[in-house]
């Protein structure tokens, strides 16, 4: 059965000198260890994350796709590459360079690899322009972070960007980033285990409860990473609150469940019980295979959770593994 992995990451061979042209202290770069098989994403001289060669080497990436039986993978930026903290004009060269490098990465095997672009989301005009440029140059969509500092996705600037993408038929993947990392989150990778799912829940509910979906075109193709974070499990809580509290429903004419048809989620939930809940909540027609490859917290055997899920008929399994992504990206 065909497999299309719509959520994977890359990081280009950015040297420290190139990153320093944007910001020596906070712009990320790649240090490759002796031997070339492993390395670290660096911030100045501080190691941010250990990584291995598939993140930057498309040849190894394709070898791994072959091993996992994946026909096509859509790669996007590692979120630390976004550059939202900088002035939009100052970061524009960086963003376009990253997007061009993503296309170079995919050019190794264009029938196996596609790219989603990043945009300078902090500047609406530049973000819209880069999204359109990226589509014209071969990207199949854009990936954005789930917030801009104190601005959630219901902020009018971000809604306007989503409206542009809907009108221009540019698919959007929303990925959590810049989550709470201090205080009680410092140990055991808690930011990735707790804060990331909470960020995605916050983003989805911000769009729903603000009424933003009422202002967005139905042509917008929107997907949330990591199975929608905590949202599927807590949908009942939000639904109950909408019915019971007027302050919850003040800006949303319909309960949260009404909007499930307006977005997709990926399948990166790692447990058959979680996937069963996800299918029951969203429907198989709203879930796409996503692995988070090649990071350690990604699905280690890409697509096997869906392929082996009890209770899925062949039609539903095909939709999740490939069919929905074909429609989402217009492939």
Name what the model sees in each region.
Residues 42-53, 62-86, 112-120, 140-144:
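Divalent metal-dependent hydrolysis catalytic cores, especially in the metallo-beta-lactamase
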């Amino acid at each position: 059965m065909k497999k299309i992995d719509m959520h994977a990451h890359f990081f280009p061979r950015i040297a420290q000198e190139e990153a320093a042209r944007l910001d020596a202290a906070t712009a990320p770069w790649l240090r490759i260890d002796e031997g070339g098989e492993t390395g670290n994403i660096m911030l100045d001289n501080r190691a941010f994350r250990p990584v291995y060669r598939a993140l930057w080497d498309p040849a190894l990436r394709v070898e791994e796709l072959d091993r996992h039986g994946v026909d096509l993978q859509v790669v996007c930026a590692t979120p630390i590459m976004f550059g939202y903290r900088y002035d939009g004009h100052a970061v524009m060269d960086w963003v376009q360079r990253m997007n061009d490098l993503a296309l170079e990465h995919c050019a190794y095997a264009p029938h196996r690899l596609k790219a989603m672009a990043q945009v300078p989301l902090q500047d609406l005009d530049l973000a819209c322009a880069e999204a359109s440029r990226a589509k014209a140059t071969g990207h199949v969509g854009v990936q954005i972070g789930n917030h801009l500092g104190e601005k959630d996705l219901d902020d009018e600037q971000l809604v306007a960007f989503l409206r542009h993408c809907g009108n221009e038929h540019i698919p959007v993947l929303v990925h959590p980033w810049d989550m709470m990392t201090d205080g009680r989150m410092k140990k055991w990778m808690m930011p990735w285990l707790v804060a990331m799912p909470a960020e995605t829940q916050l983003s989805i509910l911000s769009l729903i409860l603000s009424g933003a979906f009422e202002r967005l075109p139905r042509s917008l193709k929107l997907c949330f990473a990591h199975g929608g974070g905590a949202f599927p499990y807590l949908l009942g809580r939000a639904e109950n609150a909408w019915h019971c509290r007027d302050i919850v429903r003040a800006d949303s004419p319909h309960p949260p469940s009404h909007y499930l048809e307006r977005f997709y989620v990926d399948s990166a939930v790692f447990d058959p019980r979680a996937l069963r809940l996800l299918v029951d909540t969203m429907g198989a027609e709203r879930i796409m295979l996503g692995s988070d490859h090649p990071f350690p917290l990604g699905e280690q055997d890409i697509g096997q959770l869906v392929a082996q899920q009890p209770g899925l008929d062949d039609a539903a399994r095909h939709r999740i593994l490939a069919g929905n992504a074909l429609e989402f990206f217009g492939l």
